[in-house]
Amino acid sequence: MQEKSRVFKWDINDFKEKSFKKPTLNLTWDYKFNPHYDEILINENIEWLKGTKLFSNESDYEKFISLKTSYMNAYLYSHGNREVFRYINRLNEYIYIIDDLYLEDSVYGQEWVNQLFDRNSKLFKEDHGSSFLWQIFDDIRSAGNSEATDYLIKKTKEWMDSVILFNSKEVHSNYTFEEYSSYRGVEVGMIFALACTKVHLPPLCDEIENHPLYIELLGKYFNSIQVLINDIHSFNKEIKSSRLGNYVKIAAYQLGSIQSAMDHSQKICNDYIEAMEEKCLELESIFPNNKDLETHLYLIKTIIAGNYYGSKDPNYPRYNGTVCEADYK
């Protein structure tokens, strides 16, 4: 079969039928909403954000707050205590801003990221935003687990590295899902998010962490499910962007229909959810009666469920409202 002509830029006008319905997933895993969300007061959050000096315009802080990233964070990081949630929320807000303003549009590159994570660098000594990030890490360490914080720092840098790598790739419409997710899997940020939600716990033992099945569970299944949840629910806000970095857009060109692309993404995601459940059971059979593994697998499932139900929540305006990142870019 002859390969279709490659498309490198998204254009909604390439499709006659522009209406679509977001699909539901066969997801029965438990999720909860962090009970300390209401204690992270808006006024406190605004003052903290202003202290980062990441925005140049005063009004941009209020616009960012209106995106309610803290609301989604309460879905993703539902198990931490008040202090853990406060500092993880701050880290995620910092990351959202860095991604939207600097990394996504390639304003900063790999050299900047390398310096950002080097406490002996010139950037750390001279740039307020860099020292602010490390203050957040120090606060997380004081409230959480030290080893888990080191792991989180590592995964935060890996995520930033992956954004830069993904931006350097020329994504086109003939990508298979496997090809797309191999680049997008880390860039979507959910391994970083998983490190956030586990920061109050001791890390898994090396025997489990380095087991091929556990690595496959995260790298293939967890990442792929999260990529599809993100792409399905962020499609609304990305529909006017020419960037092709969304699997629904890629599948739409392959299938000739946005709705067909949504339905196709749903099927892939449901298949991965079913397969991941089987992989979890297989891991538990290899490491029977291991309470640490059971806890970590539970958290892996709850962060997937939290991402899904948070993305669907009509009170979350980033995916379900009229406010978008472009308003403060």
Swiss-Prot record:
Intervals of motif DDxx(x)D/E motif: 99-104
Short motif NDxxSxxxD/E motif, span: 230-238
One Pfam family it belongs to: Terpene_syn_C_2
UniProt-listed GO biological process terms: terpene biosynthetic process
Keyword vocabulary terms for this entry: Lyase, Metal-binding
GO molecular function annotations of the record: metal ion binding; terpene synthase activity
Family designation: Belongs to the terpene synthase family.
Role summary: Terpene synthase that converts its substrate farnesyl diphosphate (FPP) into 6 yet unidentified sesquiterpenes.
Domain notes: Contains several highly conserved motifs that are important for catalytic activity including the aspartate-rich 'DDxx(x)D/E' motif and the 'NDxxSxxxD/E' motif, both of which are involved in complexing metal ions to coordinate the binding of the isoprenyl diphosphate substrate in the active site.
Protein name: Terpene synthase 7
Organism: Dictyostelium purpureum (Slime mold)
Gene this protein is translated from: TPS7
